[in-house]
């Protein structure tokens, strides 16, 4: 059973998702505890390839009140993502050539209680694309409601 610890709903609104990946993430113990307590925000976070390695940037993981002041990490620190070299090279090629973005969709606990990141290769939406998506979603919602009403 996979439990989502933090979701990036804004990424689903601003981007159209083309392909998803799973990556491990390097965290400190206090950060894992904070994630389990639901103290993370991925709203403006993104992923960059720096010197052939993936880093999660601008993700906010608050520390717990019980964390000692000497061990309180920077809340917006760059966190390294762990993937196979071939996957990183493939992603880097697509991001650099096709003009795609690499965004984080969620942080979750795997079956073995390891924190993982769900990444996505995505293409940015224009304003009219966002409006079209909202209209389509609203129409589907109304259709489902009408079917429920008359069945």
From Swiss-Prot:
GO terms for biological process: trans-translation. Disulfide bonds: none annotated. Keywords: Cytoplasm, RNA-binding. One of its GO terms (molecular function) is RNA binding. It is found in: Cytoplasm. It comes from the Bacteria. InterPro entries: SmpB, SsrA-bd_prot, SsrA-bd_prot_CS. PROSITE patterns: SSRP. GO terms for cellular component: cytosol. Required for rescue of stalled ribosomes mediated by trans-translation. Binds to transfer-messenger RNA (tmRNA), required for stable association of tmRNA with ribosomes. tmRNA and SmpB together mimic tRNA shape, replacing the anticodon stem-loop with SmpB. tmRNA is encoded by the ssrA gene; the 2 termini fold to resemble tRNA(Ala) and it encodes a 'tag peptide', a short internal open reading frame. During trans-translation Ala-aminoacylated tmRNA acts like a tRNA, entering the A-site of stalled ribosomes, displacing the stalled mRNA. NCBIfam families: PRK05422.1 (NF003843), smpB (TIGR00086). Belongs to the SmpB family. This is SsrA-binding protein.
